């Protein structure tokens, strides 16, 4: 799937990137002409601030870009994850004050490998708990909770049902390069790690942002939230290719098949982001 920043977008879609010190010196005057949203790494581990956090933030803070932050985790206990959330929130507070931007918890393969070197095996229970503790700290500081993850980690590490029960206003940021995930009610989709944007030398991660990440003047387009709508209705599949059908309202339940784009189905209930008909599918990709 070939995409470039700066293409035509809808009112509910913003083209964005995420950046860190790995991108080196960025020409933000050029970049800001190509994108509408940016998620910047604030730091990692035990209060290590990203080397480009300050210049990157100062270049975009007062622009029209929709801004978020993320923190790469090296936590191997729940207390460490909570403290990382505090470190991240403090970094954001120092630069954004009380502006309500999201802060994402980023636990990946290197995080798990680091924990293993410390004699700790991070499994589904641990990863889920760490995410909740980090995001709890973020919320305590008044910032929006976001989880960065990929399909493998959703299936094998993060229990999204448990996390969403603990963090109902969770923003989900899903990395799935080359194919669009359908089941996860995501706020941001990272669709490539090899994007090209004027003003950045080398590759950069590319994102599609479906919500207003920052709450400005008390108003934001919310992330998909738990709702219940009863009553049968005809709805059309708006996904670009197909939409998975699940046996239960859970991304880890049995895959019963798929609905091609444009298919019209009769939905009898929408609850917690899932539409029920003969099976279940993500309500995010249905429209009356």
Question: Where on the chain are the PLM-derived regions?
Answer:
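Substrate-binding cleft of extracellular glycoside hydrolase catalytic domains
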Residues: 9-135, 139-141
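Aromatic-lined carbohydrate-recognition surfaces of secreted/lumenal glycan-active proteins
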Residues: 138-156
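Functionally critical loop-and-helix segments that line ligand-binding/catalytic clefts
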Residues: 3-23, 28-29, 161-227
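Short alpha-helix capping/helix-loop boundary micro-motifs
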Residues: 249-254
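A short beta-strand micro-motif
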Residues: 233-239
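Hydrophobic anchor at the start of a short beta-strand
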Residues: 67, 144-146, 172
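SH3/SH3-like beta-barrel superfamily modules
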Residues: 255-288
């Amino acid at each position: 799937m070939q995409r470039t920043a700066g293409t035509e977008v809808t009112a509910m879609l913003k083209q964005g990137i995420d950046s860190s010190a790995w991108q080196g010196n960025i020409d933000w005057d050029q970049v800001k002409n190509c994108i509408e949203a940016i998620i910047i790494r604030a730091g990692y581990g035990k209060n290590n601030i990203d080397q480009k956090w300050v210049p990157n933030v100062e270049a975009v803070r007062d622009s029209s870009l929709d801004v978020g932050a993320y923190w790469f985790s090296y936590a191997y206990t729940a207390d460490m994850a909570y403290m990382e959330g505090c470190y991240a929130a403090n970094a954001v507070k120092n630069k954004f004050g009380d502006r309500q931007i999201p802060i994402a918890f980023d636990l990946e393969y290197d995080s798990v490998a680091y924990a293993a070197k410390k004699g700790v095996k991070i499994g589904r229970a641990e990863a889920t708990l760490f995410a909740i503790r980090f995001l709890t700290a973020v919320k305590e500081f008044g910032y929006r909770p976001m989880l960065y993850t990929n399909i493998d980690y959703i299936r094998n590490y993060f229990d999204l049902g448990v996390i969403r029960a603990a963090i109902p206003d969770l923003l989900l940021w899903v990395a799935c390069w080359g194919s669009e995930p359908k089941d996860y009610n995501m706020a941001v989709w990272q669709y490539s790690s090899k994007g090209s944007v004027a003003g950045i030398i080398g590759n950069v991660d590319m994102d599609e942002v479906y919500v207003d990440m920052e709450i400005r003047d008390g108003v934001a387009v919310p992330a998909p939230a738990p709702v219940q709508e009863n009553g049968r209705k005809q709805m059309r599949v708006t996904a670009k290719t197909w939409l998975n059908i699940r046996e239960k309202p859970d991304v880890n339940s049995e895959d019963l098949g798929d609905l091609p784009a444009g298919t019209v189905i009769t939905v009898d209930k929408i609850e917690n982001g899932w539409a029920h008909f003969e099976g279940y599918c993500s309500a995010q990709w249905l429209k009356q």
